[in-house]
A protein has these predicted regions:
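Small-side-chain structural scaffolding
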Residues: 39-42, 58, 100, 111-112, ...
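GT-A fold catalytic core of metal-dependent nucleotide-sugar glycosyltransferases
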Residues: 107-134
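Active-site-proximal specificity loops/subdomain of glycosyltransferases
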Residues: 65-113
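N-terminal anchoring/stem segment of glycosyltransferases
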Residues: 1-85
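Generic signature of intrinsically disordered, low-complexity segments enriched in small/polar residues
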Residues: 9-11, 45, 106-109, 117
Length: 134
């Protein structure tokens, strides 16, 4: 994957074509630990806006905290800014519990509660930006 990032990444010496600072928000859980470091790396490599902060919203997890520390990101506990928990949501589609998906949507939409920039980009923890994006 590093080779792919190098091949498609922007020239690190080039100036950013945008002066609009943004924050990046990535909701994650422990099952995302295999991809999370790459999501962070590819975002830094391929987002053409100056990035102020990268926030990882997650449950209280030492493993995710370690990734955040190693990658210079800020971990936000998912229960620290919404007035309800995932367990408060009763949402089923075709008999399948979709409360986790619904909760994730609320987390994404509420990121303005902690982001320092007016504008922010939300990336899912399984989304690698393989080419430059504004």
């Amino acid at each position: 994957m590093r080779k792919l990032g190098f091949c498609f990444g922007k020239d690190q010496s080039a100036e950013s074509p945008s002066s609009l600072k943004i924050d990046i928000v990535i909701p994650a859980i422990e099952k995302d630990l295999d991809t999370l470091p790459y999501v962070i790396d590819f975002a830094r490599l391929n987002v053409l806006h100056p990035i102020s902060n990268i926030y990882v919203i997650s449950p209280d997890s030492e493993k995710i905290k370690q990734v955040c520390t190693a990658k210079g990101c800020i971990q936000i506990h998912e229960e620290s800014f919404l007035p309800f928990r995932k367990s408060d949501i009763d949402y089923r589609v075709g008999g399948v519990d979709r409360a986790g998906w619904m909760y994730q949507q609320f987390l994404k939409l509420s990121a303005n509660c902690f982001c320092t920039e007016e504008n922010y980009l939300v990336l899912d923890s399984d989304t690698l930006l393989a080419a430059c994006r504004t």
